């Protein structure tokens, strides 16, 4: 094999191989931490300057009737030759209005020099901004947003030998940022295994790469080399103090986790799992267990924390109104136009408390989601659910409706529930968990209609959204979400529809478990949101 062919195959392996991120805290002294925070703020300002420039060009482009007409024609055309011609015209217009990656990249060079940012960090920030512009140009994005004061963007170098280079010293990983040198805190067995794997690769990288290329040629699969790809520094404000975390992107799948006795921490089950994921709850049915629980709930204090968030926010609003009465109309609405705002010390303290509480709640939500995903993976290896629809449910209603009393109905829908419970985040985590661990993740089509089918009548019967507990045609009382999960559990691979024979044979066994579950929920006074189960 020639050197050119080897490099080509190695590049192909890098494209096909998996990636994962190791998150560890750095051991920087606090003065160095503040320097990292200052650099992060400079990157934020430089990014905002580039966002302003790209937004201006994008707005000018979208104002032209010709471009809007071409977009409409492109969306309505099916002929490939016409699509190609329209795409070329759209690209030409984007070039003429400087809405291109090349313009974005070259514009960032003088901005980066102005703020004294390394070229590699400036280029990475430009890539992030262009990714946002691409969402506006080719996806459902509306506008690119500025980073607020206090938000600290990550400091990322897309190459391991530039920006934040890595080296080995006394058998430990060390990193460098400008004149600062620092290491990392390795706190547990998983982090230790990951670091040892990276060190093992760095001892003989050429041999590991050669083994990976040979395996790709002979077996057409990718092995885990644990090559360090690049490092990212992420500053965070935790309990009033800044801390810097290192995100090391590593080639290959993550190492398995073990408990203190050396046993695998997570067990992987076998069998089918049907799950109905709502805005606030998840109901599931498996071969061994049925369940109905609130999403993103870790302990009993989640609802108390959510209420505290609201109370802090209201207190901040009262303080803001008291110190800035000139910015409000007599009816309490905010005046239009440019305004100056003054914030009291009391407001600043409340804001810090609110931010810290939001951070803690976000961490707890993420931990709860991971725990629930691991529990589901221990029950089976095939996960069947409906497609995600949280983004649609989050939006306000378009139609203005009037109730029986002649008052306008509120247009708000499920935005607050989705923010607090993260159903899409949970579904994405479950999807990754099952796919990475050798399981299967299946999303049924929209005509599956698990919430409408009644297996006792063999018919689809529409129900009101408020009917959380209802009776089947034969008189059996079922909980709506659980019954939907049962119908998803009865998924047929061949027809990709409900297996009616399985519904009949397995319903009695699963229904007994559902009755026992509801009795347990009532006995333990557990409040399941929007379930219809009344707890005394």
Model-derived regions, located:
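Catalytic micro-motifs at enzyme active sites that drive phosphoryl/nucleotidyl and oxygen chemistry
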Residues: 12, 230-236, 254-264
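Short amphipathic alpha-helical coiled-coil/interface segments
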Residues: 43, 90, 126-133, 350, ...
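Stable alpha-helical structural segments in soluble proteins, enriched in small hydrophobic residues
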Residues: 50, 124-136, 482-492
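Amphipathic alpha-helical surface "interface" segments used
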Residues: 66-76, 145-163, 507-523, 527
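Acidic carboxylate diad motif detector
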Residues: 77-240, 415-416, 420
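Positively charged, helix-rich recognition surfaces that bind polyanionic ligands
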Residues: 244-536
